[in-house]
Amino acid sequence: MSAVEQPPVYKIALGIEYDGSKYYGWQRQNEVRSVQEKLEKALSQVANEPVNVFCAGRTDAGVHGTGQVVHFETTALRKDAAWTLGVNANLPGDIAVRWVKAVPEDFHARFSATARRYRYIIYNHRLRPAILGHGVTHFYEPLDAERMHRAAQCLIGENDFTSFRAVQCQSRTPWRNVMHINVTRHGAYVVVDIKANAFVHHMVRNIVGSLMEVGAHNQPESWIAELLAAKDRRLSAATAKAEGLYLVAVDYPERFDLPKTPLGPLFLAD
């Protein structure tokens, strides 16, 4: 008796955008809303079989993504439009597929990634915003963006980020390699743009929290370098809120030839 022939398995990568303000983070959890759960449900409807996704970076509750990357495996052969338009039709309005690409067997959304890039958006005005209030962090004291930028440059390179690491972080090492960190002002908005090979838990938000203290002239420019050298989380500022944080890009080796989309969010140029 001949063995039953198994259907071929396809590996698919997707670019995902989402407003995380109504979700308890990316990762699927029991009895709470997660981005992963909504995406897997929509994909399973299109594939007509259960689908599990793996992401490049598991964002926390309230954090957004314009450049999240996921992959999944399926025996369902579908046109690209099914994985984009079809999946989007089954997703809530605050989650969307941006692109689709068939990938080789050795691709992994998390482990194949070589760098992640985040942007943190601060609405720097005396009064809080009503529009996009869950997409920015409001800070009412005047911020000196140029001062923040200068102070942040000491973080570039491979460093021990213990001072900017959440106490509950489960990473085996606090060492990370920061490729760039830029702070710029766009009218009432201050944008912190940071790229690294990977990030320890709450690293971006802890860095931003301390940079805001420097920008408000509550601490000297040298304070960030002092915190980095101290390797003590208790000395740095409070963690900045989740609302202003966006995962905007994930880098992969060129051989995977993944699509490039505008980083955003919204009007922000690349």
Curated annotation (Swiss-Prot):
Superkingdom: Bacteria
Annotated GO MF terms: RNA binding; tRNA pseudouridine(38-40) synthase activity
Class of this enzyme: isomerase
EC number(s) from the headed UniProt entry: 5.4.99.12
Record-listed substrate binding positions: Y118
Gene3D superfamilies reported in the protein's UniProt record: Pseudouridine synthase I, catalytic domain, C-terminal subdomain (3.30.70.660), Pseudouridine synthase I, catalytic domain, N-terminal subdomain (3.30.70.580)
Interaction with tRNA as annotated region, ranges: 168-172
GO BP annotations listed: tRNA pseudouridine synthesis
Residue ranges, annotated region (RNA binding): 107-111
Record's keyword annotation contains Transmembrane: no
Catalytic activity: uridine(38/39/40) in tRNA = pseudouridine(38/39/40) in tRNA
Keyword annotations: Isomerase, tRNA processing
Annotated site, Interaction with tRNA, chain positions: R58, R78, R110, R126, F139
InterPro entries: PsdUridine_synth_cat_dom_sf, PsdUridine_synth_TruA, PsdUridine_synth_TruA_a/b_dom, PsdUridine_synth_TruA_C, TruA/RsuA/RluB/E/F_N
Keyword hit for Isomerase: yes
Active site per UniProt: D60 (nucleophile)
Role according to the record: Formation of pseudouridine at positions 38, 39 and 40 in the anticodon stem and loop of transfer RNAs.
Subunit structure: Homodimer.
Xref: NCBIfam families: hisT_truA (TIGR00071)
Family affiliation: Belongs to the tRNA pseudouridine synthase TruA family.
Protein name as annotated: tRNA pseudouridine synthase A
